[in-house]
């Protein structure tokens, strides 16, 4: 849970760097305590950590993907949800679920894939898989370049 919470905070910071206000959904097969197995408990623990460490972020969970996407459904299930609108940062309980979903959406939509974005390293570095298209290589190069410029500006500020 600690590692997922830290990754969530870093991902939210990345979104803000690109001018996007993060709306974070902590995903699970459970909606707000409807299951009490280790995976659902882990995501509830992530939420508790975020409440302590990053209370200004907008997030809620644990919740299913459709609940994250559909605000009216989320409000019916949890009227006092702290997440407004549609989530734009989806936090998965494990790398398997995240990678499967990422690749399925990428293939099914034919959209431009941005990522995966490597976080928590001292220099801009990102991952390109063998399936990366030229467009994806260009996009990831642009992200690395912006990342380097931001880091340089931060160092100059002290």
Feature map (PLM): residue ranges:
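A broadly conserved detector of short glycine/acidic/proline-rich loop/turn motifs that flank catalytic sites
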Residues: 63, 95-96, 131-132
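ATP-dependent carboxylate/acyl-activation modules
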Residues: 1-25, 32, 46-50, 103-104, ...
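Active-site rim loops that border cofactor/substrate pockets in soluble metabolic enzymes
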Residues: 29-89
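General beta-strand structural signal in soluble alpha/beta enzymes
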Residues: 58-62, 92-93, 119, 127
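A C-terminal functional module that forms or caps the active site or interfaces directly
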Residues: 83-109, 113-117
